[in-house]
Amino acid sequence: MIKKIVTTCFGLVLGLCVFGVGLVAIAILVTYPKLPSLDSLQHYQPKMPLTIYSADGEVIGIYGEQRREFTKIGDFPEVLRNAVIAAEDKRFYQHWGVDVWGVARAVVGNIVAGGVQSGASTITQQVAKNFYLSSEKTFTRKFNEALLAYKIEQSLSKDKILELYFNQIYLGQRAYGFASAAQIYFNKDVRELTLAEVAMLAGLPKAPSAYNPIVNPERAKLRQKYILNNMLEEKMITLQQRDQALNEELHYERFVQKIDQSALYVAEMVRQELYEKYGEDAYTQGFKVYTTVRTDHQKVATEALRKALRNFDRGSSYRGAESYIDLSKGEDVEETVSQYLSGLYTVDKMVPAIVLDVTKRKNVVIQLPSGKRVTLDGRSLGFAARAVNNEKMGESRIRRGSVIRVRNNGGRWVVVQEPLLQATLVSLDAKTGAVRALVGGYDFHSKTFNRAAQAMRQPGSTFKPFIYSAALSKGMTASTMVNDAPISLPGKGANGSVWTPKNSDGRYSGYITLRQALTASKNMVSIRILMSIGVGYAHEYIQRFGFKPSELPASLSMALGTGETTPLKIAEAYSVFANGGYRVSSHVIDKIYGSDGRLRAQMQPLVAGQNAPQAIDPRNAYIMYKIMQDVVRVGTARGAAALGRSDIAGKTGTTNDNKDAWFVGFNPDVVTAVYIGFDKPKSMGRAGYGGTIAVPVWVDYMRFALKGGQGKGMKVPEGVVSSNGEYYMKERMVTDPGLVVDNSGIAAQPSRRIREDKEAGAEDVERGAADEVRQEVQETPVLPSNTGSKQPQLDSLF
């Protein structure tokens, strides 16, 4: 009877086993063909951030969540490979993807625990999970993981599997892979790690947060000891090495990628351009983008701009605290303050601080980002003293929890504030359009709006040279005389009213030459010129400089620069004057490399005199250059003469009520535009003229950008003649070329010549030309308005 029972039980067990094996076999047959392809492993491309560099190789921007540096398995030190194997998978080189003995141990443990509590995942299984599967603890997921691990083992070598694991695994602190972790935790190359450091990092895969040595040093130390003992047991290290490693004091020096703060606006422009092309992939493909800007130029430009804004704001009253945090709750105040300050940036040496207390004497106790506490007395508070506990200032008063800015002024901390006024500077290579410097505002962190490329502003009188260029093309000369007198135009004002424009200074000079008019920035002359050549003609002609029709008002107000455009577009347009009449396009990207180091794309810019289209007659460009040299020499931009250079030219601009101030200056090599104004347009007051506030910024930057001696000035194009210090297109030269434009704006009879006190260099004069040429003034044919519309190409990528 007993024998029969035993036999029956044995048969049942055997049957169940066979049945179970059959079920497993069926599951394998059904599941295995559905396993994902291993292409992503065989052609592994880790997610690597977009890194942007200046032309001189400084990092100016990094975009992407994952910090990873791909490293081949042979470049990882053997001691690290041994440590990871000892910690995660001792039988890595013996099993076929699944460690059967490890599984058996885990099964027993789970049965005892009454559920799935632990696993026996091999390194291969972890690769399968990290690339293809979720982290949920279910038998189905573990079964698929085991099958996928087997498939991986059949397709890839052990070293390749290890390489994938070492580069893909997350190790905390935004570090993916051991090479990245070595930098982030120890600020070392992975090949420089000691045994103690290796064992500490090898403990992270199991639980990056729990075994983070910075956050949980005690648990991390226990994990390190466990790994070192395993290495000793596997005879990977000696007893002496283990003991030395255990006794070694580790120094955590978190790697912080240094990002040059002077070119953040440029980096953002590049990021946007790549995102438009690649979407989210732009942040994961490991692109390394080299730009055209140099950090030394950026730093000088930034400081020049900030100095002007600081000076303008110096007389302003204190506007109040930057923000406020509630410190009344029962939280750890020191930790709350430190955490809040860690998210703020020091800008222009203005350090963020939080008010901890206001004493009875109204001294203010603050905490700095360093953790240091400072007491500000009345002298340190300065202009901010009236804001201390001043209920009339509401939320902006200085009180406990207020966020303010301070600066170390010779050992004394004083309260300061960021200027409200904003500014931008953009500098281009006149021949290629390459951006050499671009600062989009006072501070990128507080306001990311890029005023150089995004701010649509009225250019004011900086637009006048384009009107004058159109006039030269239409038949006028630099000595053509125009009546600078008041004018009233019925029906040309708002709602059909009378338009009565005025010169900005309220002064009128009667008949003066075009040269004199542009030098003094006479509004009445610009309007009469436009009336003479026709709004339609000018509207089409000026598009050759790169302006869109929508940026050009089809009315006489165009003569005063009432359209809207960006500082970058203005600089690009002025490059036509600087480079001899060629249309080039601004660009900030030079080269793009892939994560493998191969060149993926290189900018092929339009170059003046080579492949760039001719936008205007080179003689026209030259004459405009010579006229605008007088603007610098004796006109509204004479402050730029402080550089002591004879090759510079330019034009100032100021809009109604001094809301916008401009200066665009150049020589044949560099064009630099400066714009200053409030983001919400309002008057800057009496100091808000282009020649007063914008020119000094330009001078400070260009003194550095043009260092290295005097330039030669623009080469005289063929067909330009000089007489009595004035320059003409050869066919326009007459013995008495002074042409008058009367009140109506219609060309009238020739008049006497006004001779100007200007000396021409010997290289500028074509002797005898005035005696040989006498003919009627004629119009230069207008090129199609889309001339120069061809854009520079970024080969293979864009």
Curated annotation (Swiss-Prot):
Source domain of life is Bacteria
Sequence ranges of Polar residues compositional bias: 783-798
* Transmembrane portions of the chain: 10-30
- Identify the keywords attached in UniProt to this record, alphabetized: Antibiotic resistance, Carboxypeptidase, Cell inner membrane, Cell membrane, Cell shape, Cell wall biogenesis/degradation, Glycosyltransferase, Hydrolase, Membrane, Multifunctional enzyme, Peptidoglycan synthesis, Protease, Signal-anchor, Transferase, Transmembrane, Transmembrane helix
Reaction(s) catalyzed by this protein? [GlcNAc-(1->4)-Mur2Ac(oyl-L-Ala-gamma-D-Glu-L-Lys-D-Ala-D-Ala)](n)-di-trans,octa-cis-undecaprenyl diphosphate + beta-D-GlcNAc-(1->4)-Mur2Ac(oyl-L-Ala-gamma-D-Glu-L-Lys-D-Ala-D-Ala)-di-trans,octa-cis-undecaprenyl diphosphate = [GlcNAc-(1->4)-Mur2Ac(oyl-L-Ala-gamma-D-Glu-L-Lys-D-Ala-D-Ala)](n+1)-di-trans,octa-cis-undecaprenyl diphosphate + di-trans,octa-cis-undecaprenyl diphosphate + H(+); Preferential cleavage: (Ac)2-L-Lys-D-Ala-|-D-Ala. Also transpeptidation of peptidyl-alanyl moieties that are N-acyl substituents of D-alanine
| Membrane-side (Periplasmic) residue stretches | 31-798
Q: Where is this region: Disordered?
A: 751-798
Q: In which pathway does it act?
A: Cell wall biogenesis; peptidoglycan biosynthesis
Residue ranges, annotated region (Transpeptidase)? 414-700
InterPro entries, A to Z:
Beta-lactam/transpept-like, Glyco_trans_51, Glycosyltr_51/Transpeptidase, Lysozyme-like_dom_sf, PBP_transglycosylase, PCB_OB, PCN-bd_Tpept
> Membrane topology per the record?
Single-pass type II membrane protein
Xref: Pfam families: PCB_OB, Transgly, Transpeptidase
Q: Where in the cell is it found?
A: Cell inner membrane
Q: By its UniProt entry, which SUPFAM superfamilies does this protein fall under? A: beta-lactamase/transpeptidase-like, Lysozyme-like
| One Gene Ontology term from the biological process aspect of the record | peptidoglycan biosynthetic process
Q: What does this protein do?
A: Cell wall formation. Synthesis of cross-linked peptidoglycan from the lipid intermediates. The enzyme has a penicillin-insensitive transglycosylase N-terminal domain (formation of linear glycan strands) and a penicillin-sensitive transpeptidase C-terminal domain (cross-linking of the peptide subunits).
The family note in this entry says:
In the N-terminal section; belongs to the glycosyltransferase 51 family. In the C-terminal section; belongs to the transpeptidase family.
Q: Which PANTHER family match?
A: BINDING PROTEIN TRANSPEPTIDASE, PUTATIVE-RELATED, PENICILLIN-BINDING PROTEIN 1A
Q: Please report the name of this protein according to its UniProt entry.
A: Penicillin-binding protein 1A
What is the protein's species of origin? Neisseria cinerea
Gene name, Swiss-Prot/TrEMBL? mrcA
